[in-house]
Structure formats: C-alpha cells, structure tokens
C-alpha cells in the first residue's frame, strides 16, 4: 500500500538499501556481471555503490542517493510558503549528495573516469530535481562538480551513450562536452517520459 511504502522510506537505512538494490537491478538488467562491480572500494576505505567497466577498463562510478525527508515534506506542504522552504532544504540535501560523490568517488588516479553518475531511484524525486526547483539549476551545479544525474528511466540510455563515446574519444579531454551532450539526452528522455505520463492521465480521464 502507499502507506506502507511511505513508512518504509521513513527509515533511512531501509531507504538506502532500497536505493542500492534498485541501482544493482538496473545495472544487472543491462550488463553482464563481468562488466560491473557492486560496492567498489577505494584506497580511502570509501565504497561506491557500483562501478561500470568501460571498454578501456576505466571505471565509471555510480552511486545511489535518495533524498526523501524534505522531498516528502515539500510534497505534503499545505501552502506555497512552506513548499518554498522545504524546496530550499531539499536542494541543500541534493547539493550535499552531489558534493559527496564528487569528492569521494571521482578518482582518476585510482582508475575512474573524471566524472560520476548519481542514480536517483525514485522518478518523482528525480523529476523534482530536474524540472521543479525554483531559481536553482541542479543539473548545472552537478555538471560543475562533474556529476551526472540519472534515474531508472534514463540510466540505460545514459550509460549506453557513455560507452559509445569511450570507444571513440579520450574521455579526459572531452569530459565537459560529453557531459553536456549526455544531459541533453537525459533531459529529452525525462521530458518524453513526462509527456507519456500526461498522455496516460489524459486518456484515463
């Protein structure tokens, strides 16, 4: 039920586990086991949730981040003033997660790409990040930190594009260009998903 789903997400540990399992399921759906690592550890002792082996054996770090508490308060707020307040808190939460990924997991000296993916397991949360934050460009902030935001619906397309580009270019020389191209693909995919959602709502009415 919806109630039990919300109750589950009130527990940060269970919420984190659900996000990690969602990421693992997405990776396993599209790639054979020898192409990815679950819980890849760095010399610092930190572990990224997943690392995808690209064609030239460079690792693409992917970490699941699920910012739920202030998002739920934002959704349930009863007026625009409260919504704006929780929206700012939600943005702050997301920014901290982006900074964490950028600092801990983008480690070219240890064989990673010089950018990473932040996997947002809930489409509604992802959509809020990309489309509905007033006066804030989350994607631009993430780009400057070399982090690309993806969701279950945009994950496969994003990684497929990255793999293709890795076959043809030296990634460290082209990172910003690739990130911008990828963001365009992801944004178009997210818009298409939203268009289908609106069409479904229209047809059901």
Model-inferred region functions:
Residues 1-205:
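Amphipathic, heptad-repeat alpha-helical coiled-coil/stalk segments that mediate oligomerization
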